Amino acid sequence: SQAIQLGSYNMEARNDAYFWRGESYYRMGEYENAISDYRTYLNNTRQRNTDMYALAYYNLGYSYFKLRDYSAALNRFRQYVDLESNRQAASLADAYNRIGDCLYPNRQFSLAEENYSRAVQLSPSAGDYSIYQKGFLLGLQKDYKGKISAMDRLISEYPESQYVDDALFEKGRSYVLLENSSSAAQAFEKLIREFPQSSLARKAGIQLGLLYYNDNQPEKALAAYKQVISNYPGSEEAKIALQDLKSVYIDLN
């Protein structure tokens, strides 16, 4: 801030100070103030071939993104990817993911998919998010087989990913929609077995009970519901399982 007050002393130092103050505001979650400072920096700096200039667009994109102003965020991320000279930069792959995320609420699915694909190409080691999102978008377009193959790719190529439990759940749901109950059950069972602490394991237990019930396997349905009740006492899913359990018993009698 001192450099900003002494602005006439050195214009470029003053402009850089706006960038750094914008950074501070961003880290504190004061996104409107961050936007104001980044924009002041971008409008006034004469040094436009620098890493800092490109990064300001990236940070500005994130500030808008945090405020859910996706169209403004989209424009800034696109400006950043045009300006970034280092094609290996982790922030470049990340920006393509965010571009995909900005296009998704406007239902521009194929464009979003393209950007997720670019992110995977640029940074294969961090491609799990991009592949998950691509699969999710395929599901929204009712391409359930495409979605399953994306989820399978994530599970096999990124076994340590934080998205593996999500991928198994979405895979199971896709098989349900394809009316392939045995493959759906396998996906849900694997999720429950390998990620018992995941909130999705509870949901998978309910799905499993329903699958077995609809598949005329009441004994297996009862076992699935009982497992949810005993493993996750007090949860919302345990309450649902108890209701469903009663319904199965009524049907059996």
Model-predicted regions and their roles:
Residues 1-253:
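Acidic, polar-rich low-complexity tracts and alpha-helical solenoid repeat scaffolds
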